[in-house]
Swiss-Prot record:
NCBIfam families given in the database record: rplP_bact
Keywords: Ribonucleoprotein, Ribosomal protein, RNA-binding, rRNA-binding, tRNA-binding
UniProt function note: Binds 23S rRNA and is also seen to make contacts with the A and possibly P site tRNAs.
Species assigned in the record: Corynebacterium urealyticum (strain ATCC 43042 / DSM 7109)
Subunit-level organization: Part of the 50S ribosomal subunit.
Region (Disordered): 1-25
PROSITE patterns in UniProt: RIBOSOMAL_L16_1, RIBOSOMAL_L16_2
GO annotations of cellular component type: cytosolic large ribosomal subunit
Biological process terms in GO annotation: translation
Comp. bias regions, Basic residues: 1-16
Protein name: Large ribosomal subunit protein uL16
Length: 138
């Protein structure tokens, strides 16, 4: 699972999800990318499930880059606890994703297999995504 090794503060405010992604919105490393179309939080478990879905489909001969990292803690108080008495413990780690952000990149010689692998990974994520090619961006 992806979590930060060390953080300066255990609990943070919730991040802003409005607006478009300012950076990380072009395919730079691989040939194909998975681009978010909606603002959302993506947890470390969802990132791992999408990575496994890609790797199971392509097996060998390709390379996968994960462009997001869950560096924001989300807290939650236990069920049945009354209001007050401080902020709850960290429940999960999330990556704040804005529309236009490239989540995963991959390079693979077979285009159809690469598209299918990214489609399967997109099914594991909580937002609408689209598949983009490197040559179609510019």
């Amino acid at each position: 699972m992806l979590i930060p090794k060390r953080v300066k503060f255990r609990r943070q405010h919730r991040p802003n999800r409005s607006g478009m992604s300012k950076g990380g919105n072009r395919v730079t490393f691989g040939d194909y990318g998975l681009q978010a179309l909606e603002p959302t939080y993506i947890t470390n478990r969802q990132i791992e499930a999408a990575r496994i879905a890609i790797n199971r489909h392509i097996k060998r001969g390709g390379k996968v880059w994960i462009n997001i990292f869950p560096d924001r803690p989300l807290t939650q108080k236990p069920l049945g606890v009354r209001m007050g008495s401080g902020k709850g413990p960290v429940e999960k780690w999330v990556a704040n994703v804005k529309p236009g952000r490239i989540l995963f990149e991959m390079s693979y010689p077979d285009e159809q297999a690469a598209m299918e692998a990214l489609r399967r990974a997109g099914a594991k994520l909580p937002c609408k995504v689209r598949i983009v090619k490197k040559e179609d961006q510019f």
